[in-house]
Curated annotation (Swiss-Prot):
Interacts with MinD and FtsZ. It comes from Bacillus mycoides (strain KBAB4). GO terms for biological process: cell morphogenesis; division septum assembly; regulation of cell septum assembly. Cell division inhibitor that blocks the formation of polar Z ring septums. Rapidly oscillates between the poles of the cell to destabilize FtsZ filaments that have formed before they mature into polar Z rings. Prevents FtsZ polymerization. HAMAP family: MinC. The gene is minC. This is Probable septum site-determining protein MinC. Keywords: Cell cycle, Cell division, Septation. InterPro entries: CAP/MinC_C, MinC, MinC_C_sf, MinC_N_1, Septum_form_inhib_MinC_C. The keyword Cell division applies. The lineage of its organism: Bacteria, Bacillati, Bacillota, Bacilli, Bacillales.
Amino acid sequence: MEEKKQQNVTIKGTKDGITLHLDDCCSFSELLKELDEKLSTHYYESDGRSLIEVRVKVGNRYLTEVQQEEIRTLIRNKKNLVVESIESDVITKAEAIAWKEETEIVPISKIVRSGQVLHVKGNLLLIGDVNPGGTVIAGGNIFVLGSLRGIAHAGYDGDSEAVIAASIMNPMQLRISDVTMRAPEEKEDGAEAAECAYINENNHIVVDRLQLLTHLRPNLTKLERGIV
């Protein structure tokens, strides 16, 4: 009995286009050859006005940028097809380290004094104060267990979902992503309480009571393990 040939490329139609499941064990050259053959055999007809979106899933195979471009070019050369995404279940060690740095909580215990700048890639948990003239900057969220009386910039790399929270919120300036808020009005003596700042639907920074944070950003609960 003739042995059935291993299928390295599986094509599945979806309501949004097609999905290509590519085997992660065969050689890359074998994969490209079979992909070319199968896409040439199947003719995908569109309405003439729109392209058919293709999602490519490569499993546990890591693709270099050059290899990804080879796949994109091959698919692009077939009529009516355009690559929407190429998805892999693996990343390089360098990418993993970069992701960890961007998402981890960095706990620091100190006072940020006037003229000093504290900068972290991920989420900042500062146990201490930010004095007037001091600056804290984070790629993610900023949590200050103390007084925030200087400048705080969260989401500096464009994260508009980032928040700033402090036990005592009386800053010189707040900035989230590219949105800036000057110092809010000073509170009456004894009126200081834990507050948070976030960007609202009108693209303005709003300062409100800390208790609202879990409703505004429910995903922040995932950071609790990093804080505790």
